[in-house]
Amino acid sequence: MKIALFSDIHANLPALEAVLADIDRRQPDATYCLGDLVGYNIWPNEVIAEIRKRNIPTIAGNYDFGIGRSSDDCGCAYKTDEEKANGKVSISYTNDRVGDEERAYLRTLPVHIRVDFHLANDPEHLWSSTETFSLLLVHGSPRRINEYLFEDRDEKSLLRIFEQANADVICFGHTHKPYHRILTGGDEATRFYHAVNLGSVGKPKDGDPRACYVLLTIPESAHAGSSESVEVEFVRVEYDVEKAAQAVENSRLPNDYAESLRKAR
């Protein structure tokens, strides 16, 4: 089974359109969005409309959670006073632009989606002989919508998160930096866990300004005892970055956000 997953669009319509066109071309079996549809760019309503039009299963990001409740707190972790000041402008701007219908939609979004694959070893006794391979979709982490799971997270800490979530694969976003880590654990037999950060469609921070999403392939032979039960492809998609950057500069959003798009920082 091939699944397309993307996250952190952040109101960047040109980036989303490019990603969706690429997904359409590849024709996966399923598509999921892991949140943060709004914030930092000028097209929050248009992004929400596109996701709704396609009926893409979507979870709430921290920014969606805040805007859905007309809050002036996006649950973001800003490092400097300048970032905090810019962040206040962004959430005020987004609250002003998002319509009532779009805001109501954001409030309906769940905080996680679990997809269980029941892998039958004996077709005549499906339930009694089935192994479950579990995929958990979250925005930040299974514990908090705005928890950052960076690539250098301590392995023991990350394993605890997997064990508490009872998941074989956890896909998430929030950091805007893509990676795939394979961890091993389990008492009786080795069990492999996959941590997959999807990166960002509309606001990458890994030095590559192209939009990013993931194609996740789960073969029929998938099981927790194999490190090859999940194939992860990070797909980078060109889009008109300059159009998005100039749109920011022509709005009351901070110009720093335009440079962030150009430099992916």
Regions found by a protein language model. Give the residues of each.
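N-terminal active-site segment of His-dependent metallophosphoesterases
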Residues: 1-56
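Active-site neighborhood of phospho(di)ester-bond hydrolases with catalytic His/Asp-centered motifs
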Residues: 6-7, 31-36, 57-62, 138, ...
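Acidic, His/Gly-rich catalytic cores of divalent-metal-dependent hydrolytic chemistry
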Residues: 182-265
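Short active-site segment of divalent metal-dependent hydrolases/proteases
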Residues: 11, 38-39, 64, 142, ...
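Metal-dependent catalytic neighborhoods of phosphoester/phosphodiester hydrolases
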Residues: 15, 37-54, 67-79, 181-184, ...
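Beta-strand-turn-beta hairpins that frame and shape the catalytic cleft
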Residues: 1-3, 115-136, 189-194, 228-230
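Active-site neighborhood of divalent metal-dependent phosphoester bond hydrolases
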Residues: 47, 54-116, 121-124, 132, ...
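Anionic-ligand binding region
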Residues: 152-186, 190-198
